[in-house]
C-alpha cells in the first residue's frame, strides 16, 4: 500500500479557499497478485461566513483504476449551508457529501473477518448523501437539538451473504464463509438527536434514527436495521469522567446461500438476528496532563450481539488501558 495526501488553504476576510489532492495505490501478492488498484482524489472548497448565510461548497473528483478493468471517474458535490435567522433556537441547514471506498481484500476483511479467501471487488463503493433539517440551542444553551431527513444513493453497495452446506432440511455447516455482492441501494432516513446539559459537567444524549431501504436491484437482504437509537448520561470532571448508556438496534436479516450436499441443489434462505440492546459504561481518570487511565465495558446485560450472522458476541466485554499524549 502506498498513500500520500497534500492540502493547502487560504483565508481572506470572510472568504476561504482550500484544495486537496491524494493518491493511493494498492497491490496484492501471492494469491492476490492479479489485484492492482490506483485511486486519485482531488477536492476543492470555497467558503463564506456571512451574517445570515454560512456556506461552503465544492466538489470531490475521484479517478479509480483497477487492473484489467476500465477506469471509473466520479464527481461528488459538497455543500454545507447554515442559515442564521436571528435566533439560536432555530437554524435550518442543508448538507451534501459522499465518499468512494475501494473494496480490496484488505478492506473487505476489515469489514468482515469471515470473508471467503481470496476475494476482492473490481469496483469501488460510491455514496452520494444529502441531509436537510433544523437544529438549535435553547434554554440558555442547556438543550441542543438536531432533527433532519437524509437521502443516500449507494452505488456498488456491499450485500453480504453467508454460505451453508445442507442436506434436506438439516444444516450440516452454517456460516462457513461470507461473500459480498454489489448492487445499487437508496436509503431514506429520519433522524433526531438531542443533548441536555443541566449542569456544566453533566450531560445526557438521546438519538433516534429510522431507515427506509430500496434494494430493488438485488434479491439479497441488506443486513441493516430499520431503527437504531441510543440514550446515555455523562459526567465530565477535571480529573474524572464517566458515563453509561444503552444502544438499541432493530432486527436485521441477511441472505443465506445453501448448497445441498446430496443433490447439489442451490437455493437462498435468510438469517435473522434479534433486537439488540447493548449496555455500555466508560471511566477515565486523568492522572496527569499526558496520562489517562481508562476502563470500558460493553454488553453488560449479556445479550447476543451480532455484527455478522451466525457469530454472536457472548457475555460482557471489558477493556482497561492507558492513554498517553506527548
Name the predicted role of every residue range.
Residues 43-165:
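Long, internal scaffold/assembly segments composed of regular secondary structure
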Residues 1-4, 34-40, 71-77, 124-130, ...:
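Residues that define the transmembrane beta-barrel architecture of outer-membrane proteins
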Residues 1-51:
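Outer-membrane beta-barrel transmembrane domain signature of Gram-negative proteins
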Residues 14-16, 25-31, 52-54, 63-69, ...:
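Gram-negative outer-membrane beta-barrel proteins
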Residues 19-25, 57-63, 94-98, 147-153, ...:
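Transmembrane beta-barrel strands of outer-membrane/channel proteins
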Residues 4-10, 23, 42-48, 79-83, ...:
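Residues on the lipid-exposed face of transmembrane beta-strands in outer-membrane beta-barrel proteins
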Residues 12-19, 50-57, 88-92, 140-146, ...:
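Repeated loop/turn-to-beta-strand initiation elements of outer-membrane beta-barrel proteins
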Residues 106-123, 154-185, 211-230, 249-286, ...:
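Outer-membrane beta-barrel domain signature, especially the mid-to-C-terminal portions
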